[in-house]
Regions:
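Glycine-rich, proline-tolerant flexible connector loops at the mouths of alpha/beta enzymes
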Residues: 57-83, 104-117, 168-194
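Short acidic/polar active-site loop segments enriched in Thr and Asp
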Residues: 54, 165, 220
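Short beta-strand segments
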Residues: 25, 103-105, 170, 223-228
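N-terminal capping/small domains of soluble enzymes
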Residues: 1-107, 148, 156
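Non-globular sequence segments
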Residues: 105-164
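Alpha-helix-loop-beta-strand connector modules within alpha/beta enzyme cores
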Residues: 73-101, 182-220, 226
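Active-site glycine- and acidic-residue-rich loops that bind
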Residues: 35-36, 149-153, 158-160, 192-205, ...
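Active-site-adjacent beta->alpha loops and helix N-cap segments on the catalytic face
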Residues: 117-129, 133-142, 176-209
């Protein structure tokens, strides 16, 4: 057996049959005007599937919350036109024999005011910080937390409905979920801050809400990392 045989062999992951173990990681492209996946996005992902990638994880796609986005021209996963755009991407990838999952994204405190189309909306953060010691963002209430959990669950449900094969939840790189996990940016004194278990509660509730929407046999992926862009 060569060193590449295992990498290129098929694998079944929680009922998801992949042609090989090559996974394309998410990469933001900023190529979706009006936050709608376009012909260019369709072709971009189609080519990766045609090249033989076993599983494509899309660029971060923002959930249905007013402060989810922090960058221009990134795709969203809510709204009729945007979901129709993603369906075209999914269909193109499937036509090439590939599998694809969206990365559901909320940037949290990394959002700055002025980013279109939401404009003058603050970044949302567990303790009003985009990095330790700098209180310069909006501090989320428990009602806000509930709204974001619901937005992730809705994104997972809609992703499954348009034909995605799995869903990845972005919990890494200093964005909102990571801001809750990180003691440096989570100084809350309620049920979502303090101990590691409490700091992880928000993430756990998002995963549970998504699971409730997609069912027990649909693959869910949680991405997390030690590295943060604030490092």
């Amino acid at each position: 057996m060569s060193s590449h045989d295992t990498l290129l062999s098929p694998v079944n992951v929680g009922g998801l049959q992949l042609n090989n173990r090559v996974v394309m990681a998410p990469m933001t492209r900023n190529q979706s005007p009006d936050n709608v996946p376009t012909d260019a996005n369709v072709e971009y992902y189609r080519k990766r599937a045609a090249g033989g990638v076993g599983l494509i994880v899309t660029e971060g796609t923002c959930v249905d919350h007013i402060a989810a986005s922090g960058y221009p021209n990134v795709p969203y996963i809510h709204g009729e036109d945007r979901l129709a755009g993603w369906k075209r991407v999914v269909d193109a990838v499937h036509a090439e024999g590939g599998k694809i999952a969206p990365q559901l994204w909320h940037v949290g405190g990394m959002r700055k005011r002025g980013v279109a189309p939401e404009g003058d909306v603050d970044g949302y953060a567990p303790s009003g910080m985009n990095m330790p010691g700098k209180v310069n963002r909006y501090t989320m209430t428990t009602s806000d937390i509930d709204d974001v959990i619901a937005a992730f669950a809705k994104g997972a449900r809609d992703a499954k409905a348009v034909g995605f094969d799995a869903v990845e939840i972005h919990g890494a790189h200093g964005y909102l979920l990571d801001q809750f996990l990180w003691e440096g940016t989570n100084q809350r004194d309620d049920g979502y801050g303090g101990s590691m278990a409490k700091r992880g509660r928000f993430v756990a509730e998002i995963v549970a809400a998504c699971r409730s929407e997609v069912g027990s046999d649909f693959p869910l992926i949680l991405r997390w990392s030690q590295w943060k862009q604030q490092d």
